[in-house]
A protein has these predicted regions:
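Exposed regions on extracellular, virion, or secretory-pathway luminal proteins
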Residues: 204, 428, 432-571, 582
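Residue-level detector of short, conserved catalytic/binding motifs and their immediate flanks
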Residues: 167-169, 203-206, 471, 486, ...
Length: 769
């Protein structure tokens, strides 16, 4: 049984990460940041802060509602029964993903190669680490426009870890209906085989993925091929790695870092959506609260992320204060946000880059590479991590609104923008106008076009109907070729920057010269912080000449500008008000997780935008969800009947969750009959001795993470503080020591085993060949 451990995890701010790197060159000397649970959750007034995602509660392996995005992408109903169609090779799978993503100047996903990492698959390619590196792929691109349909929203929500040697893809993908990430494994992913898809053992996965979401490391991501030494090792293979470049810049792993950073907040935002609006989660006030949160989120996205939070914004203040009051009742000491950061690890310090195949399996260079598999305790993803931060009531409303804004794709906002603007152009909404005095200068360019510079308004507007603007327009033969408004400040004091002039014209009128402009921000219409569209800008000035405009326009020419705003956003607020008053428990504003497709369907219906085919919520046509095999509650009774000793049964009780699966990673030394298990335990005894002995050392003196790991103990209801002195641990250590003593004739010595190097100790499983 494997889990998807993206081995280079989410970084915090670059400056903080760089400081960590400066203190710990190579990452090898970095100390563990684990802190006791009581310290992590201590809050004000005697209250304990609450985990937004509790690392001790992995949740059920199979989703109780909905399915993963991966299932929706690759389910196949063309056969007699629903199944999966997963393209092979990996480049074909990637091409299928690209079909759902919007083309962009940069690839819509980021990919790195990791030959010597920290995932459970890290030993699978030994000793051919460089020939069979692990691929990590994260989707960070926007969905492709799909007329009449939502399409899948994969950005920050789909991560793949592919290991060619084992034919395994480990998957983390989002479940829209459940509001959580799912952990899956694809087996037999190789030419000629039929891939099988399983949901993974979440308890195993969340031992490292303590945020129940993807991980990535702090900069400088030295396990990836952004590290020049790693890239050089891969290049010596002289093979194609599934179309993935070997030489890459740090922008690629940084893109994965950014994606996992955003993904880490998704479960926390879902918690706020479901519970922050009040204890009566489906009551009328809670529904109205969610309606207001969604309204502000849509306003925020339509306005191009303009900041609308102001002290004099009464609607916002009412919403924020009500939500803060509910927050203080439920989470008086705040919400703890899980830490997805694991330390950077440099696997090739000082290695002479000679291809292992050129020197043989017994050569010191090959042996040195083998030793790079060692993961010190301080760098192990299994180490319990303290919270990344604590969210508190005063910031709750802004956290919820800006978080919800990220649950909508660019295509969703573009579609809504067009629909609202079309309604406004049809005369269905009120308009208001703002004006300003302008100074104009003109200059003829070498290509024959004319540049007209505009400076309108004096200083910053303070209300009323005045606005200010600085920009330029390029004209040819009376038509606007292009232009830009560098700064546009509206009467409410909000300033728009980088506004594009997308069209317009210049003509003579009875009033003089008239310049009419259409404005946009990117592919959407320009909008103010209130969400309303800027329908047009008109500038007029006296022009006594017969020509529309000439290059000798006086330098001090003065004109007058009128900015027209269409009040089209209130239609959205009205639809949300209607939804808030509805009582359907399954609708867009219920206490269920925020479901993008459900919200968009409701908006489209309410605004008369036409039917919308929803993706990734209804799962009735998908193949049955299957969970990968792992021990059940009756296994100990079966083992006792088959002759397992008491101590062997203790091994099963504490270790079977991870080590009795039918997969070799993590080592399944408890898989098989009691006789086979005894042989496995004897083969694994050296490593077991080291791992168990770590519980007797201070945390900063441990060379390896102790086993069972802390989170496994908590799941078993044991105290990490009491476990080191427990008779159960003493019995396990004695059993393993006796195995080693029966081999060597003397008591094992921890220091001697550590001196040999953990990766040179006998492996936990015999060679299957």
């Amino acid at each position: 049984m494997t889990l998807f451990a993206l081995v280079v995890a989410l970084a915090g701010p670059w400056a903080r990460a760089a400081a960590v790197e400066a203190r710990s060159p190579g990452g090898a000397g970095e100390r563990s940041t684990a802190i006791p649970a009581a310290s992590a959750t201590a809050g004000q007034g005697g209250h304990a802060a609450t985990w937004a995602v509790d690392p001790r509660q992995p949740g059920p392996d199979l989703p109780t509602v909905g399915r993963s995005l991966f299932d929706f992408l690759f389910a196949d109903d063309s056969g007699a029964a629903p199944g999966y169609r997963i393209p092979f090779p990996f480049s074909a799978l990637r091409a299928e993903l690209a079909r759902h993503l919007r083309p962009a100047p940069v690839p819509p996903f980021k990919q790195v190669l990791i030959p010597l990492g920290r995932s459970l698959q890290r030993t699978a390619a030994a000793p051919q680490f460089a020939r069979y590196p692990r691929v990590v792929l994260a989707v960070d691109g926007e969905p492709a426009p799909l007329p009449g349909a939502t399409g899948p929203f994969l950005k920050d929500r789909l991560y793949l870890g592919y290991m060619e040697k084992t034919g395994v893809i480990e998957v983390i993908s989002y479940n829209e209906a459940a509001g959580r990430f799912e952990f899956q494994i694809v087996k037999d992913y190789r030419a000629g085989d039929e891939p099988r898809v399983f949901y993974a053992n979440r308890a195993v996965c969340t031992a490292c993925h303590q945020n129940a979401a993807p991980l990535f490391s702090r900069p400088l991501w030295d396990e990836t091929n952004a590290n020049g030494r790693v890239a050089a090792l891969l290049e010596q293979e002289q093979r194609d790695f599934y179309g993935i470049p070997v030489q890459i810049g740090i922008d690629v792993p940084n893109g994965i870092d950014d994606a996992t950073d955003r993904a880490n907040q998704i479960p926390a935002i879902q918690l706020l959506w479901q519970r922050a609006c009040g204890a009566d989660a489906d009551g009328q006030e809670a529904r109205r609260c969610r309606g207001r949160a969604l309204r502000f989120a849509l306003q925020y996205r339509l306005a191009g992320h303009l900041q609308f939070v102001r002290a004099d914004h009464r609607e916002w203040q009412g919403f924020a204060e009500a939500l803060a009051g509910s927050w203080r009742q439920q989470w008086p000491a705040g919400l703890l946000i899980s830490n997805p950061d694991i330390p950077n690890r440099r696997p090739l310090p000082g290695v002479v880059l000679i291809h292992p195949g050129a020197v043989g399996a017994a050569h010191p260079v090959t042996d040195h590479l083998q030793q790079q598999l060692h993961v010190p305790s301080a760098l192990d993803p299994l180490q319990p991590r303290p919270p990344l931060e604590t969210w508190t009531a005063p910031e709750g409303a802004e956290r919820l609104v800006t978080g919800l804004a990220g649950f909508l794709a660019d295509v969703d906002v573009e579609r809504l923008d067009r629909a609202l603007y079309d309604r406004a152009r049809g005369g269905a909404v009120p308009h208001r106008q703002y004006d300003a005095s302008c100074g104009l200068t003109a200059k003829r360019r070498d290509d024959g076009s004319l540049r007209l510079s505009l400076t309108c308004g004096g200083g910053e507007p303070t209300g009323g109907t005045a606005f200010a603007m600085v920009g330029r327009v390029y004209l040819r033969d009376g038509e606007v070729v292009r232009g830009a408004i560098d700064r546009l400040t509206l009467p409410d004091g909000v300033t728009l920057i980088d506004v594009q002039v997308t069209g317009g014209s210049l003509a003579n009128t009875a009033r003089g010269a008239r310049l009419a402009l259409q404005l946009s921000r990117g592919v959407r219409h320009a909008r103010g912080a209130d969400g309303n569209a800027i329908e047009g800008l008109e500038v007029v000035w006296e022009n006594p000449r017969s020509a529309v405009i000439a290059a000798d326009l006086p330098p001090a020419t003065e004109g007058h500008a009128v900015l027209t705003v269409a009040e089209d956003f209130p239609a959205v607020a009205a639809v949300l008000d209607v939804l808030a008053e509805a009582g359907d428990a399954g609708d867009a504003l219920s206490s269920q997780p925020f479901r993008r497709a459900t919200v968009l369907e409701a908006l489209h219906t309410g605004l008369g935008m036409g039917a919308l085919q929803a993706c990734c919520v209804e799962d009735s046509g998908l193949p049955p969800a299957a969970v990968d095999e792992h021990p059940d509650d009756g296994v100990l009774r079966q083992l006792a009947a088959q002759g397992a000793t008491h101590t062997e049964q203790v091994f099963y009780h504490y270790c079977a969750l991870c080590h009795q699966t039918n997969e070799r990673s993590p080592p399944n030394f408890l898989h098989g009959t009691p006789a086979q298990v005894r042989d496995n335990l004897a083969h694994c005894a050296e490593r077991l001795y080291v791992r168990l002995a770590m519980w007797g050392l201070p945390s900063d003196a441990r060379s390896k993470t102790p086993m069972p790991p802390v989170h496994a103990l908590e799941e078993l209801g044991l105290s990490p503080a009491a476990w080191p002195e427990s008779p159960e641990l003493a019995g396990l250590r004695r059993y393993v020591a006796d195995l080693l003593q029966s081999e060597t004739g003397r008591e094992p010595v921890l220091a001697e085993l550590e001196a040999r190097g953990y990766e040179k100790l006998r492996t936990c499983l015999a060679d299957p060949g």
